[in-house]
Curated annotation (Swiss-Prot):
It catalyses: D-glyceraldehyde 3-phosphate + pyruvate + H(+) = 1-deoxy-D-xylulose 5-phosphate + CO2. One of its GO terms (cellular component) is cytosol. Thiamine diphosphate binds at H73, S113, H114, A115, G145, A146, N174, Y285, E367. Homodimer. GO terms for molecular function: 1-deoxy-D-xylulose-5-phosphate synthase activity; magnesium ion binding; thiamine pyrophosphate binding. It comes from Kitasatospora griseola (Streptomyces griseolosporeus). InterPro entries: Dxylulose-5-P_synthase, THDP-binding, Transketo_C/PFOR_II, Transketolase-like_Pyr-bd, Transketolase_BS, Transketolase_C, Transketolase_CS. This is 1-deoxy-D-xylulose-5-phosphate synthase 1. Its cofactor is Mg(2+); thiamine diphosphate. Pathway: Metabolic intermediate biosynthesis; 1-deoxy-D-xylulose 5-phosphate biosynthesis; 1-deoxy-D-xylulose 5-phosphate from D-glyceraldehyde 3-phosphate and pyruvate: step 1/1. Keywords: Isoprene biosynthesis, Magnesium, Metal-binding, Thiamine biosynthesis, Thiamine pyrophosphate, Transferase. Pfam families: DXP_synthase_N, Transket_pyr, Transketolase_C. The keyword Transferase applies. Binds 1 Mg(2+) ion per subunit.
Length: 649
């Protein structure tokens, strides 16, 4: 009987004989390769933590002891060992989350997949346990480059303050985040990997001196006072110990017995301890181990033998179009530089970095520093393009506001994965950036609808030298081009379905396709519409306000939360201009969305052509006397109630 099928929880794991653990590890790797290559997901990080996860659940009593996974994408093995072995729909609608999920299991305590936060959680949990008299250990596993984030070091500084608070920090050191980890800390950890001789030398010296008659013990005591100097010279773990943190390691993270021994020592110490484990991302799957780009960090469904995509891409992606345009701009403008935060390839900067390595700055998982450093680059006379996932720019809002916008600096932010992302769940949806950035004075935002507009808007953005600019686009493949039939001011008119249209459909970026489909459906229902793309959604173009006044109703459609988004900004601009046309804003509900595909989520929240048409028709029938009704039309019921404004916005 396979070992894995006998594991329904950590207690079953602890009953296994040590000789059974390597076969179990091999079984888990085979399971991961078989399942994750079929469904897609984070393969490389999880192959690297198999033995570490086994050891953690054998030494600590989860969920009584708290095990926290920083970033969380390396928690697949943890899920398997805590009774969740149905990976057939991992990251799919109604399947397991690709991250820890409190709704799934009491073994999952935190589920935020943004990096460098687990140590802060662990600090607070350990403090709460101490104050409430709860006897248990808190364990935080951090790796995949998360120690390059400043939050982790802020937490370490506080954790070290209490020497009697049981907290174990496991550093999963695989030398990588998405790609190889960069920066001084990476070099420091690399140094620790190569100084095993220090501990052997110290142990030999202690033994030899203490066995020497008369002078041995006093001499050892004197030399022991010089321990810090030896450590700083030979093994820089002194950096951790100078903070007041006990350091154990480095340890082979694939040696279960060795990891268990270190974890038991750490647990019994009773204070904050760092256990430094050396692991190999992609361990046990040769294609992953040989992939120098990212060790199969995250894969789409692939053939496990050929590693070819199960469903080859049918066209270019938003990311690839941006990457090619950056490469072209780099050749034209020597002052253009690229900045990213540990995601060079995922945001499309790989070609630029290869062509211009000296003009590419990957700062690690440190978004705040990325933006502040970009401000410095702009102050120095360069034009930085900061490319990150939309959800991660939230982490650097203060730097955008105070270090870039306040100084009126020409910094361009390119936000990949904007709007509904889908499979990676709530924390990866880029559904807040349009709302958050609306409040930044002077900042301009473009939302391209197709490949041509990506190229156009990126070029326009990097030409602005006296204010920050933003270009946002979603994850995935591009749809067909949506050419304009007319441009009014800076607004592209995409379609008119009648000589005097009733409704102005304002399509934000990739919502253009849904709005064009909706306009056709509405025309069949007797409701005529003009479909426009504002292109630059902040500030609101006066031409858009004039167009709103020329229609009987305005409907904005955006891949962003409704609160504070483009619809809200247009409503305010209309009020300021005394335009009393009723406005309805369609967008993402103000809630954390469960994981599912982008298409499934857009359909569920009504941001497809059918959904937009149904909601628009319902409002039009109520607000616009004399509008037609398509026979057999069904009322659309959104997940959350739409704002019912009986009076004009």
């Amino acid at each position: 009987m396979p070992l894995l099928s006998r594991i329904t929880g950590p207690a079953d794991l602890r009953r296994l004989h040590p000789e059974q653990l390597p076969p179990l590890a091999a079984e888990i790797r085979a399971f991961l390769i078989d399942n994750v290559t079929r469904t897609g997901g984070h393969l490389g990080p999880n192959l690297g933590v198999v033995e570490l996860s086994i050891a953690l659940h054998r030494v600590f009593d989860s969920p009584h002891d708290r095990i926290l996974w920083d970033t969380g994408h390396q928690a697949y093995v943890h899920k398997l060992l805590t009774g969740r072995q149905d990976f057939s729909r991992v990251r799919a609608k109604d399947g397991l989350s690709g991250y820890p999920s409190r709704a799934e299991s009491p073994h999952d305590l935190i589920e935020n997949s943004h990096a460098s936060t687990a140590l802060g959680h662990a600090d607070g949990i350990a403090k709460a346990d101490q104050l409430l008299g709860v006897d248990r250990c808190t364990v935080a596993v951090i790796g995949d480059g998360a120690l390059t984030g400043g939050m982790a070091w802020e937490a370490l500084n506080n954790i070290a303050e209490a020497e009697d608070r049981p907290l174990v920090i496991v550093v999963n050191d695989n030398e990588r985040s998405y790609a190889p980890t960069i920066g001084g800390l990476a070099h420091h950890l690399a140094t620790l990997r190569t100084t095993k001789g220090y501990e052997r030398f110290l142990a030999w010296g202690k033994d030899a001196l203490q066995r020497t008659p008369v002078v041995g013990p006093p001499l050892f005591d004197a030399l022991h006072g010089a321990k810090k100097g030896f450590k700083d010279a030979f093994a820089p773990q002194g950096m951790f110990e100078d903070l007041g943190l006990k350091y154990l390691g480095p340890i082979d993270g694939h040696d279960i017995a060795g990891v268990e021994q270190a974890l038991r020592r750490a647990r019994n110490f009773g204070g904050p301890v760092i256990v430094h484990c050396l692991t190999v991302k992609g361990r046990g799957y040769r294609p992953a181990e040989q992939d120098e780009a990212d060790r199969f960090h995250a894969v789409n469904p692939i053939d496990p033998y050929t590693c070819l995509p199960i469903s080859p891409s049918a066209g270019a992606s938003w990311t690839s179009v941006f990457g090619k345009e950056m490469l072209a701009l780099g050749a034209e403008r020597p002052e253009l530089v690229a900045v990213t935060a540990a995601m060079l390839h995922p945001v499309g900067l790989g070609p630029f970095a290869k062509a211009y390595p000296g003009r590419t700055f990957d700062v690690g998982i440190a978004e705040q520093h990325a933006v502040a450093s970009a401000a410095g680059l702009a102050t120095g006379g360069l034009h930085p393009v900061v490319a990150v996932y939309a959800t991660f720019l939230n982490r650097a809002f203060d730097q955008v506001l105070m270090d870039v916008a306040l100084h009126r600096l020409g910094v361009t932010f390119v936000l990949d994965r904007a709007g509904v992302t889908g499979n990676d769940g709530a924390s990866h949806n880029g559904m807040w950036d349009l709302s958050v950035l609306q409040v930044v004075p002077g900042l301009r935002i473009a939302a391209p609808r197709d490949a041509a507009r990506v190229r156009e808007h990126v070029r326009q953005a990097v030409a602005v030298e006296d204010a920050p600019t933003v270009v946002r686009f979603p994850k995935g493949e591009l749809g067909p081009e949506a050419p304009a039939i007319e441009r009014i001011g800076g607004v592209d008119v995409l379609a008119r379905t009648g000589p005097a249209p009733d409704v102005l459909l304002v399509a934000v970026g990739p919502m253009a396709a849904a709005c064009l489909d909706a306009a056709a459906l509405l025309a069949a229902d007797g409701i005529t519409a003009t479909v426009v793309d504002p292109c630059w959604v902040k500030p609101v173009d006066p031409a858009l306000v004039e167009l709103a006044g020329a229609h009987r109703m305005v409907v904005t459609v955006e891949d962003n939360g409704r609160t504070g988004g483009v619809g809200a900004a247009l409503a305010q601009a209309m009020r300021d201009a005394d335009v009393d046309t009723p406005l309805r804003d369609l967008g993402i509900p103000q809630e954390f969305l469960a994981h599912a595909s982008r298409g499934e989520i857009l359909e569920e929240i009504g941001l497809t052509g059918t959904g937009v048409a149904a909601q628009t028709a319902a409002h039009a029938r109520r607000l616009l006397p004399g509008t037609g009704t398509r026979p057999g039309a069904q009322e659309y019921r959104p997940r959350m109630p739409l704002t019912d404004w009986s009076e004009p916005a």
